[in-house]
Amino acid sequence: MIIKRREYMRIADYSVTKAVLDRHGFTFKKSFGQNFLTDTNILQKIVDTAEIDQNVNVIEIGPGIGALTEFLAENAAEVMAFEIDDRLVPILADTLRDFDNVQVVNQDILKADLQTQIKQFKNPDLPIKVVANLPYYITTPILMHLIESKIPFQEFVVMMQREVADRISAEPNTKAYGSLSIAVQYYMTAKVAFIVPRTVFVPAPNVDSAILKMVRRDQPLIEVEDEDFFFRVSRLSFVHRRKTLWNNLTSHFGKSEDIKAKLEKGLALADIKPSIRGEALSIQDFGKLADALKEVGL
């Protein structure tokens, strides 16, 4: 049975958070990027943004002492929370003791066998959403690991450093746009839902955070001949942001006359000027470029 808690008993209330940490003698580890959210209004906004209800299973990453988990468990069919810090497992058993729809998995999400784990949901056929306050130091590896996995995650609503959220959701011809924008938006739509100030965390991080909502596309944004080559071309085009596309391409592929002839032919096929910078190219442009370079033998 799921028990709905009263507002003043919320885990995220600062006094409750402090009492829990003191009771268990918990100290923060910088290596785990631990910052616990202490604002119940923001937690409710996260759940609302993710549109969590009884027809959804949730995977949470880094539950901490269970502040967000509590809100998720009240709304979702089931929550599977991955926590790498084994010191937090007994704390979560304490703070979430009233819920029978929460599984705490003491594993690194990057090493977990997710295909096996999701079968542990009581109803594994329900749509799965990822909702999490991601550690700043490992946000991108976790996101790309989950996005590129074969798990049919429906959407992600995740908190991360504001700068990273801006980069992921960026459009061409903006300072934030780059290979990360392309890597994520190829698979998913991405939009910043709202900003979270640094002042609502314990301990307070050095920067503000953002809630990013990403919804998986029915199919990738574009069709390309070779996905690995497409991502490789997009990455190398931003190695030196102030350099032209031509300079970045020749720095990677080489500057022999044969290579330069192939690059010129590929750029012409894609109808892209060598003097342009990578930040001016759309994902569709990069798709055309990658296919053209592949066609000329690069």
Curated annotation (Swiss-Prot):
Pfam short name (any one): RrnaAD
Location of this chain's protein in the cell: Cytoplasm
Gene Ontology MF term list: 16S rRNA (adenine(1518)-N(6)/adenine(1519)-N(6))-dimethyltransferase activity; RNA binding
Residues that, per the record, bind S-adenosyl-L-methionine: N35, L37, G62, E83, D108, N133
Class of the enzyme per the UniProt entry, highest EC level: transferase
Keywords for this protein: Cytoplasm, Methyltransferase, RNA-binding, rRNA processing, S-adenosyl-L-methionine, Transferase
Record keyword Hydrolase present: no
Enzymatic reactions: adenosine(1518)/adenosine(1519) in 16S rRNA + 4 S-adenosyl-L-methionine = N(6)-dimethyladenosine(1518)/N(6)-dimethyladenosine(1519) in 16S rRNA + 4 S-adenosyl-L-homocysteine + 4 H(+)
Gene Ontology CC annotations of this record: cytosol
Function: Specifically dimethylates two adjacent adenosines (A1518 and A1519) in the loop of a conserved hairpin near the 3'-end of 16S rRNA in the 30S particle. May play a critical role in biogenesis of 30S subunits.
Family: Belongs to the class I-like SAM-binding methyltransferase superfamily. rRNA adenine N(6)-methyltransferase family. RsmA subfamily.
PANTHER family hit by this protein: DIMETHYLADENOSINE TRANSFERASE, DIMETHYLADENOSINE TRANSFERASE-RELATED
Protein name: Ribosomal RNA small subunit methyltransferase A
Gene name per UniProt: rsmA
